[in-house]
């Protein structure tokens, strides 16, 4: 992951860090609360009850639903029991897929994720050891597109994952969507090609190459 005190376009950040593919993160600098870990450093310890996504030092996902300090401690202890450490923890959500099944219900209100609104979605999923899936959808700002509610995004991600691996996604997690939704490949933003809007973001999740 990459974070910065200011905001930059995701493609600019990706180029600086030789990212082969990148997506926007959880825009955690929008407020000063939540539970946030980046590159092994805990930046905030003020959980506000969102679903959390933990990524450990082996690259595996762990989740906590509507997490408070007790649930956070449980996940950290479970990761430590594996001989690993938590490298990143994201606080946006919600969790959309768990053990191959969509888990988000349309009737649920979830913080600022616009649960029932059809909009752009950015989703990160784990399919297996060091195997991941990024889902980026268009929304009403894109000509000819309507976007997805969170429940629709959960089902869509679960369906895609099952076409790639028989067991589907281990976990899928909703990141900041809307105009922040940025999917970058080879330093170019490739999602929403008909929408010229490119919002600057404060953090990205990226997969990099050692070759400049």
PLM segments and residue spans:
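Gly/Ser/Thr/Pro-rich low-complexity, intrinsically disordered segments
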Residues: 1-212
